[in-house]
Amino acid sequence: MGDALSLLEARLQTVVDSEYSTVFNSDGRVLAKAVTAPRSHPPYANSAVDGYVFFGGLSKGAHCFELRDGRSAAGEAFAGVVESGQALRIFTGAALPQGTDTVVLQEDVLVEGSKLYVNGPLERGANARSSGEDVVQGAVLFAAGHRIQPQDIGLLISVGVAQVKVFKALRVAVMSTGAELCAPGTEARLDQVFDSNRPMLKAILQRWGMQIVDMGIVPDDASLVRQALDEAAQQADVILTSGGASSGDEDHMSAILSETGNMSLWRIAIKPGRPLALGMWSGVPVFGLPGNPVAAFVCTLVFARPALMQLSGSGFARPQPLTLPANFNKNKKVGRREYLRARLRNGEVEAFTSEGSGRVSGLSWADGLVELPDEAVQVTAGQLIKFFPYSSFGL
């Protein structure tokens, strides 16, 4: 499993072109170029409080200032100069007038006529924000490959960025294969099952900001599978299929990919997940996921997601686990990496009662996955384990 991921990371590169987007419409987009700050934030020295502004700090004891006429307010800066020994009324966010650098809170002073009385000590620069205290002009805000979040939009606009260069959305063709499948909303025969994989995969890909090319359900017919792959390769940057990845007589996907001589990493050591086929079709990467919905879901998060992120320009995404105590017992044999449907409750990780890959309900019961390593493991209650929340996979 680890070797397969490393091989994917080494071989895959960004396949999408770039374009410019306004910052307002950039949520979820991947930067194709680093962004630097055209303006400092804050752009000018300003007051952090309502009070009075003057020059220099105060030593211990009583002090008296001459009050200047006027004031400095946010958006209405004082145009004059405040001389030594003078003070001026100022409000939160207002620019510090020329000749000042320190602000005293309004509740800490006494005003009598044109005189301002205040007791020290007070450090020079108190209650004032310097220009560029948050971000300095020219600073790199985000590197290429960063996926823009809502909070990033606030930062970009704060420093005057109006547009950003981003990668175009990765186009992912999604198809399901199998004669046993019927479309949702139709009446299923007793020997049919509803195609749940394709709608599930489409929803996942949309969460990841990708453009969906829906290829529908493809029957178990080699010529029809080839035709669907041809059409998908013309419309998409990558192809995601479910079903037909095993070596059964009616599972044509793996056989067709093998014919081209471009299929590799056959039968990844992952549970649930085998079989999993990887190949190329007309120069387009193909991920042949298992037909089982649980296995397809897990393989998409654990295996396909890092590769899709690499292809989309955001880099090979490896989720960060939480290390938490288990609230279950399990003996795992050596041989393959296992992922258990699990959820976090009261600071502990519960595992779904059944490990059967046919139990689709376990995906909704869970809010994440427990990862167990390739080697043999005996998990006991209270033991620290790796838990990956669904959110760590971008869901």
Which residues are covered by each model-predicted region?
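Structural signal for hydrophobic packing residues in well-ordered secondary-structure cores
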Residues: E9-V16, A34, L96, A139, ...
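Conserved active-site and cofactor/substrate-binding residues in soluble primary-metabolism enzymes
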Residues: D3, S18-S21, N25, R39, ...
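Flexible glycine/proline-rich
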Residues: L5, E19-F24, K33, G75, ...
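Short, glycine/charged-enriched hinge/interface segments at domain edges or termini
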Residues: L7, Y52-D214, V349, T353, ...
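Intrinsically disordered, low-complexity, positively charged segments
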Residues: M1-H63, I148
